[in-house]
Amino acid sequence: MIKALVGLGNPGPKYKDTKHNIGFKVIDEVAFKLHLKNPLEKYMSIVFHIKEQDIYLIKPQTFMNNSGIALRQFVEKTKIAPSDILVIYDDMDLPIGTIKMKPNGGSGGHNGVESIIRELRTQEFPRLRIGIGRPASKEEVTNYVLSPFEYKDTPIVKKTIEKASEYAIRSLEEPLEYVMTLCNTKSS
């Protein structure tokens, strides 16, 4: 079972509703569902800690491309293995509304995941990938991920965040392989 959920995103109101911050949105939804309040600021992150179960919800505050720095600090202090940390992030290779889990792997071109791989010196950490779709041209990637979802996509995005938060919570309570099978066989 997972011991920490890490949602990737960028800090500050400017980025709050961007596609790149969907990992933060999932963490916020998990915290809401678990009735968690008053997060701490530590490990260069916003952190919710469920002491009874020793579970963490983390939103690195280092900006996306340096997420690994915050996560390395967390791992060094808590001694939680990377394989027990579920990283939640946006994925342009998946259509909007799609959710997929995988046990490990490369960065897939995601700078936040690349930073984590570099800082933790391993690819052996599970991921919960949330589809945000792809822009029409490669030149638009930065603007695309740093812009909000289109209004027409709002209902599906809300439903996706809700569903992703359910998988994240289940990963804290049930074997990851089981949750992964559920996630990857559902039509998300």
From Swiss-Prot:
It catalyses: an N-acyl-L-alpha-aminoacyl-tRNA + H2O = an N-acyl-L-amino acid + a tRNA + H(+). TRNA binds at residues 15, 63, 65, 111. The keyword tRNA-binding applies. The record marks 10 as: Discriminates between blocked and unblocked aminoacyl-tRNA. Disulfide bonds: none annotated. It is found in: Cytoplasm. It holds the Pfam family Pept_tRNA_hydro. Keywords: Cytoplasm, Hydrolase, RNA-binding, tRNA-binding. Hydrolyzes ribosome-free peptidyl-tRNAs (with 1 or more amino acids incorporated), which drop off the ribosome during protein synthesis, or as a result of ribosome stalling. Catalyzes the release of premature peptidyl moieties from peptidyl-tRNA molecules trapped in stalled 50S ribosomal subunits, and thus maintains levels of free tRNAs and 50S ribosomes. Belongs to the PTH family. PANTHER family: PEPTIDYL-TRNA HYDROLASE. Monomer. This is Peptidyl-tRNA hydrolase. It comes from Hydrogenobaculum sp. (strain Y04AAS1).
